[in-house]
Amino acid sequence: MTPTTSSDPAAPTATTARPATAPATAPAAAPPPTAVVAAARGPHAGWLADALAEVRRDPRAADRVLPLAGRRVGRGPLRPGTDPAGVVHGTVDDAARAAVVLALATAHGGDARGLAEHLADLYRAGDTAERRGVLRGLDALAAAAPDGPPGPVVAVGRELAADALRANDTSLVAAAVGPFAAAHLDQHTWRHAVVKLVFQGTSLDAVAALDERADAELARMARDLATERRAAGRPVPDDLARLSGAAAAPRTRTADTEEP
């Protein structure tokens, strides 16, 4: 059963992924993303290093470590100068939890289905911050594995991203449009996620690969929304102009399907 976080009637739905055709690899083998490295080297590096080692030895430790991250490493923004709330680029505890997800992938080894189920359980049992951490962890897995996460992880990740996109919490929605979403959400779901950010007033800097995935349909949606706002005497966000200039056709096709 896929979790839900709000009753947003316009929310996109998840797309069913094709089953994996290749055995899973250990996604943590490649260098982790910059934010994860920064978290691991921060002032609380000792606790985080011990926690990650514990998770690598016993994946069940993630159930305890993930909720503790905020209290142990802090909840400040990763980029306080440009993102003081930590909504767009995430927080220190987001990065620490992403590192926990990488450690969890190592602990599960080639058991891709076990990893996928564990990530789903952590997300479903978690509060908003922990759910963000799982989503940021999916981004870390997407960046760390040369061929991306294994099939079962992608399938579950799509479900979790779709759930987050039904939420009204801006930080959760922003965490669901990172590199994992850029690589694996279908175009219909991805477009609606981008437009939802505009509705919420969240900078589109949160969206990974925006220029690569923007297309004529997204530009049309943005123009229509801008027209509606002008007719209602409401301000038009600058990001709508940014979307209105999208390319006439998708420049890349990364997800398995186009429209549901």
Task: Please report, for each region that a protein language model flagged, where it lies by residue.
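N-terminal alpha-helical scaffold/docking segments in eukaryotic complex subunits
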Residues: 1-109, 188-260
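Eukaryote-skewed repeat-based solenoidal scaffolds used as protein-protein interaction platforms
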Residues: 96, 101-232
